[in-house]
Design a protein with these regions (language model features):
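Bacterial N-terminal signal peptides that target proteins for export
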Residues: 1-8
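Bacterial Sec-exported substrate-binding components of ABC uptake systems
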Residues: 19-94, 197-232, 355-392
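Short helix-initiation/N-cap motifs at beta->coil->alpha
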Residues: 68-70, 128-140, 177, 268-278
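A short, structured surface patch at a secondary-structure boundary
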Residues: 84-143, 149-155, 263
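Extracytoplasmic ligand-binding site segments that recognize negatively charged/polar headgroups
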Residues: 109, 114-117, 157-161, 175-186, ...
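Structured C-terminal subdomain patch of bacterial secreted/periplasmic proteins
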Residues: 186-191, 197, 297-392
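Alpha-helical, coiled-coil/dimerization segments enriched in small aliphatic residues
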Residues: 242-272
Length: 392
């Protein structure tokens, strides 16, 4: 019995010693702290410093985006390889780049330039490393970039968009053609990038400036609204042509919002720019004429027109109200992000008494700072030298 007790004690001691020497189980790693669920809305001070804000964590099962065609597109997480494609791309790109995530999320894009230049390289230090697509790139070329989202204007849906959808590439359509569409499409991008705070900030930037103009012009009677004409000058092909925009385009909406009366509203307008004769321009004899020139220096065009005897007979020329539309990298009349500058500038030209002290250079600097994080030095060197048109 005594021997058995001794053996038992010895056996127990061996077992305890073995347990003490055995390797300990590695504890399970703790989960990393969750990413911030709200992105800061402030834009960094300089383009080079613009960093993507932390995207909100998508809800379980992902999130759904409703685009300009009322389609719903579901994502499991914010897209990391975005492609911008289709026609009229630069207008869409400029809006997308108001989100600081854009620079790192966009993997490939088509041409973002126009006749007067290319803005995106000024604000995206990584622009040269992105895949450059041809303007007529098809679905296969776009798919080769392996995007998890393609963004394009809805006008491309029936052609390029349909082909991408057929091979299961997620496509989100936007318009960015009118003030109302800007509010809607910014909200769409806010959901897509999971940065709704930034979408609200940019939308508020636009709305506050529209409200400032409409408040100033709200009490005007029709007789107090100058008869106004917007003309697109084009001499491509060696023949000079003047064109007026459709009633639903941003140029017409600018005139109406800025407190003017578009004289071409009863013309036989098409879906795009409509050519008009000099005889028709003379018949309208508008109080104020705004000249747009996308592929010519607008100041040179205005100088040429003022020297023409036929134009010298017009009321607007006699009263020094023939204006070259304000332009920097792109013209401010287009449905590019700069339309808000164009609206403010036009209102100041039509009703200088309602906008005393309006300084469009200051307005432009605020625009680039608030929407693109461009500091004063960069604005002075990259934007201000390009500012042309009737801007004092």
């Amino acid at each position: 019995m005594h021997r058995f007790r001794v053996l038992s004690i010895l056996l127990l001691a061996v077992m305890l010693t073995s347990a003490a020497c055995a390797p300990q189980a590695t504890p399970a790693p703790t989960a990393p702290p969750p990413a911030p669920t709200q992105a800061p809305t402030a834009v960094p001070a300089t383009p080079a410093a613009v960093q993507p804000t932390a995207a909100a964590a998508p809800a379980a099962g992902g999130f759904t985006v409703t685009d300009a065609l009322s389609r719903t597109v579901t994502f499991s997480q914010p897209p990391q390889k975005v492609v911008l494609a289709g026609k009229a791309l630069f207008m869409v790109a400029d809006a997308i780049y108001t989100f600081p995530e854009a620079g790192q999320r966009i993997a490939a894009l088509g041409s973002t330039g126009q006749g007067s230049g290319n803005f995106i390289p000024m604000i995206d230090p990584g622009f040269s490393s992105k895949i450059s697509l041809k303007s007529d790139a098809g679905a296969e070329q776009i798919a080769a970039a392996q995007p998890d989202c393609v963004i394009m204007k809805s006008s491309n849906a029936a052609t390029l968009g349909k082909s991408l959808e057929a091979i299961n590439v997620p496509v989100v359509y936007v318009d960015f053609e009118t003030p109302d569409q800007y509010q809607r499409d910014l909200k769409t991008l806010g959901t897509l990038f999971q940065n709704e705070d930034r979408a609200k900030t940019v939308a508020a930037f636009y709305q506050s400036r529209v409200d400032a103009v409409t408040k100033a012009t709200a009490a005007l009677t029709d007789d107090q609204k100058p008869r106004t004409l917007v003309l697109y000058y084009n001499d491509q092909g060696g023949t000079v042509a003047f064109n007026v925009p459709p009633m639903g385009w941003i140029q017409t909406l600018m005139v109406q919002t800025a407190g003017g009366r578009p004289v071409w509203k009863d013309a036989n307008l098409g879906n795009g720019w409509t050519k008009v004769t000099l005889e028709q321009i003379a018949a309208w004899d508008a109080d104020a004429i705004f000249i747009v020139a996308y592929f010519n220096p607008v100041n040179d065009v205005v100088t040429k027109l003022k020297a023409d005897p036929q134009w010298q007979a017009l009321k607007a020329v006699k009263n020094n109200q023939l204006y070259g539309f304000a332009t920097d990298v792109y013209s401010w009349d287009e449905s590019d992000t700069r339309w808000i500058l164009g609206l403010t500038w036009m209102a100041g030209k039509l009703h200088p008494d309602l906008f005393p002290g309006l300084d469009m250079k200051t307005e432009a600097q605020t625009f680039y700072q608030d929407l693109y994080g461009m500091d004063a030095t960069t604005f002075q060197s990259n934007i201000l030298p390009k500012l042309t048109g009737d801007v004092p």
